[in-house]
């Protein structure tokens, strides 16, 4: 809206306004379907659970939900989501006044860089898993 890329700027504190992910966002999901004739079990849900900018991409297939996304038997929380929410609280660390609306961009950039590296690996792993499953279905 204002034509600025805050990820490249030098401002440390930025108001969380007019961004696609909001402080209240709980996940970002993309469903990758299959082509006509392919088995529906080859669908992949690419998930960033918790506050998306602090999360990593995790591939989820119909019959394989990664342990880090499954609920803990005591808390019924996803361990990954709890970790990501902790990171979000660090990024939105100001508690007084309107501080809850300010993002620490220095910390967010650091977290996003780490999570991006992990996400790239997870994309590769997800596609390999999908290819292996597709081959096993053809047997």
Map each language-model feature to its residues.
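C-terminus-biased signal that marks the final domain/tail of proteins
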Residues: 1-139
């Amino acid at each position: 809206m204002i034509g600025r890329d805050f990820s490249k700027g030098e401002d440390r504190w930025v108001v969380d306004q007019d961004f696609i992910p909001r402080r209240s966002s709980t996940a970002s999901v993309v469903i990758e379907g299959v082509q006509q004739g392919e088995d529906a079990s080859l669908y992949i849900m690419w998930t960033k659970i918790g506050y998306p900018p602090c999360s990593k991409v995790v591939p989820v297939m119909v019959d394989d939900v990664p342990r880090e996304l499954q609920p803990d038997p005591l808390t019924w929380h996803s361990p990954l989501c709890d970790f990501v929410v902790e990171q979000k609280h660090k990024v939105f660390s100001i508690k007084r006044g309107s501080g809850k609306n300010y993002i620490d961009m220095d910390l967010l950039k650091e977290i996003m860089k780490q999570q991006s590296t992990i996400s790239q690996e997870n994309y590769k792993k997800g596609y390999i898993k999908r290819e292996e499953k597709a081959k096993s279905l053809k047997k």
